[in-house]
Regions:
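Conserved alpha-helical substructure of the radical SAM core
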Residues: 43-77, 86-87
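Conserved AdoMet/S-adenosylmethionine-binding subsite of the radical SAM
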Residues: 66-67, 74, 83-213
Length: 260
């Protein structure tokens, strides 16, 4: 089922990448996910927005997209995990046929599906989320049983995106509780081989839906920003390719994003 919100998401690019960022992106969320990440509010049993998801037939979907086009041509497909939507290829094609730009979020678990979408020119900006520095950490974060889902497949997805001409790739990881410079370096090394990839760091977005017993908290904002500045200074490959979203304000407001 879908949750659709008009002009809500701030594009996480500067505009220098040939992407129109004058308008925010419409958000199209799919309710299903194959991960249960500890920091994701949608994984919480307390998540209270489930009633905002609705089924849409093809004619209804087309009508909604056409109406949204009048106020902006950027569309962000997210979730949940949008590759689980059995109609995702058709949904994306509708947006592209109407002249839209597609930002596509994925946890990277389904690289073959993503490759199909890329090969058909249905993705303009691919955002892939990392779940840990090691396969073991990724398993613990994503709460899945098969390591390939949250590790090997993720790298395949990044590689497919990086090798697709004209597609921008953003790799995201979420920081919480504490982070060291050495950890940021290790994360950057994992994706450094993929030419042109952007490295995005989200400080934990606090939510009333996150159970307090998890003990998750934001990293000190100034400390994290200073570590990222150091990374860019010492590793020139990342200059103008690091994106920092410190809190939930930066999700929906462009001036809440720091580009380094």
């Amino acid at each position: 089922m879908y949750r659709i919100r008009k002009n809500i998401m701030a594009p996480k690019l500067t505009g220098n990448e040939g992407i129109n960022i004058e308008n925010k992106s419409h958000l199209i969320m799919w309710d299903k996910c194959n991960f249960r990440c500890v920091f994701c509010f949608q994984s919480s049993k307390n998540f209270a927005c489930k009633e905002q998801y609705h089924s849409l037939g093809k004619d209804e979907y087309i009508a909604v997209i056409m109406k949204l086009m009048a106020s902006g041509r950027n569309f962000k497909f997210s979730g949940g995990e949008p590759t689980l939507n059995p109609r995702i290829e058709w949904d994306l094609q509708v947006v592209k046929d109407l002249g839209g730009t597609i930002f596509f979020d994925t946890n990277g678990s389904n690289p073959d599906k993503v490759k199909t979408l890329l090969d058909k020119g249905l993705i303009d900006v691919l955002a892939v989320s990392f779940k840990g520095l090691t396969p073991e950490e990724a398993l613990q974060t994503a709460k899945v049983k098969k390591q390939e889902f949250c590790w090997g497949n993720v790298f395949k997805t990044i590689e497919y995106g990086a090798k697709t001409p004209g597609v921008k790739v953003i790799v995201t990881h979420v920081c919480y509780n504490d982070v060291t410079y050495e950890e940021l370096i290790e994360y950057s090394k994992l994706i450094e081989p993929y030419e042109g990839v952007f490295y995005k760091i989200n400080n934990l977005h606090q939510s009333r839906y996150l159970p307090a017993e998890l003990g998750l908290k934001k990293v000190d904002s100034n400390n994290l920003l200073n570590l990222l500045k150091r990374l860019v200074e010492e590793k020139p490959r990342w200059k103008e390719h690091v994106i920092f979203v410190d809190d939930v304000y930066g999700v929906t407001n462009y001036d809440g994003i720091v580009f380094l």
